[in-house]
Amino acid sequence: MRQVAIYGKGGIGKSTTTQNLTSGLHAMGKTIMVVGCDPKADSTRLLLGGLAQKSVLDTLREEGEDVELDSILKEGYGGIRCVESGGPEPGVGCAGRGIITSINMLEQLGAYTDDLDYVFYDVLGDVVCGGFAMPIREGKAQEIYIVASGEMMALYAANNISKGIQKYAKSGGVRLGGIICNSRKVANEYELLDAFAKELGSQLIHFVPRSPMVTKAEINKQTVIEYDPTCEQAEEYRELARKVDANELFVIPKPMTQERLEEILMQYGLMDL
């Protein structure tokens, strides 16, 4: 079983990318569970046809400790198993703790079955605080992909996430598998992301072009592969799935200093001197 965490800044398209990637892996015959670790609890919406899934934390609040697995785990598109950890009530508690509670509960209830090829954790990545780092800190996820674009804030976040990975890689087995570019159609985007990934000692594993098909599929509450498996964008996600499945380049990243990051951004025209 490969346990994979997908990180990236809020709004970058992590959840969309994760759900389309897992649909691509399903097309390859893989058995998958997706665990949403974002308080927005939208990590599995497309796989479940738009059903707002009841989160682990909401279920715990309503039902107490006697929770059954089938009340927090739902099967979505292609039999992909879906769980949302959820978040605390706004202004109370810590969302990171919710992730810890959820993963522990899934383990107790026997969700990690032997037939699983992949478990994906879709994690909010602007803050690499202790709780959000849980999937990598506790040795749950062994490989990490960061979703980024050619925008400055996405790269700042990706560099920060790399610092978190570096910290926990020394004590555990977690490694960076690569950067996934979710294109924003920024000038020199491919070249910038490729240079950024290489600077970290990693790779740009796939460049996902921007496409109106993604929005169309989302309006229909589906992944692109389910909505129109014949379109070019569906093939992009299948290609991403093939690359992730075949990936063998796992590194402890070498995060950049602020100065070096800004140099790269200037080199590719994102920051004017």
From Swiss-Prot:
<keyword id="KW-0004">4Fe-4S</keyword>
<feature type="binding site">
    <location>
        <position position="129"/>
    </location>
    <ligand>
        <name>[4Fe-4S] cluster</name>
    </ligand>
</feature>
<dbReference type="Pfam" id="PF00142">
    <property type="entry name" value="Fer4_NifH"/>
</dbReference>
<dbReference type="InterPro" id="IPR027417">
    <property type="entry name" value="P-loop_NTPase"/>
</dbReference>
<feature type="modified residue" description="ADP-ribosylarginine; by dinitrogenase reductase ADP-ribosyltransferase">
    <location>
        <position position="97"/>
    </location>
</feature>
<dbReference type="InterPro" id="IPR030655">
    <property type="entry name" value="NifH/chlL_CS"/>
</dbReference>
<comment type="function">
    <text>The key enzymatic reactions in nitrogen fixation are catalyzed by the nitrogenase complex, which has 2 components: the iron protein and the molybdenum-iron protein.</text>
</comment>
<keyword id="KW-0560">Oxidoreductase</keyword>
<keyword id="KW-0067">ATP-binding</keyword>
<keyword id="KW-0013">ADP-ribosylation</keyword>
<keyword id="KW-0547">Nucleotide-binding</keyword>
<dbReference type="InterPro" id="IPR005977">
    <property type="entry name" value="Nitrogenase_Fe_NifH"/>
</dbReference>
<comment type="subunit">
    <text>Homodimer.</text>
</comment>
<dbReference type="GO" id="GO:0009399">
    <property type="term" value="P:nitrogen fixation"/>
</dbReference>
<keyword id="KW-0479">Metal-binding</keyword>
<feature type="binding site">
    <location>
        <begin position="8"/>
        <end position="15"/>
    </location>
    <ligand>
        <name>ATP</name>
    </ligand>
</feature>
<dbReference type="GO" id="GO:0046872">
    <property type="term" value="F:metal ion binding"/>
</dbReference>
<keyword id="KW-0408">Iron</keyword>
<feature type="binding site">
    <location>
        <position position="94"/>
    </location>
    <ligand>
        <name>[4Fe-4S] cluster</name>
    </ligand>
</feature>
<dbReference type="GO" id="GO:0051539">
    <property type="term" value="F:4 iron, 4 sulfur cluster binding"/>
</dbReference>
<dbReference type="InterPro" id="IPR000392">
    <property type="entry name" value="NifH/frxC"/>
</dbReference>
<protein>
    <recommendedName>
        <fullName>Nitrogenase iron protein 1</fullName>
        <ecNumber>1.18.6.1</ecNumber>
    </recommendedName>
</protein>
<comment type="similarity">
    <text>Belongs to the NifH/BchL/ChlL family.</text>
</comment>
<keyword id="KW-0535">Nitrogen fixation</keyword>
<dbReference type="GO" id="GO:0005524">
    <property type="term" value="F:ATP binding"/>
</dbReference>
<keyword id="KW-0411">Iron-sulfur</keyword>
<dbReference type="GO" id="GO:0016163">
    <property type="term" value="F:nitrogenase activity"/>
</dbReference>
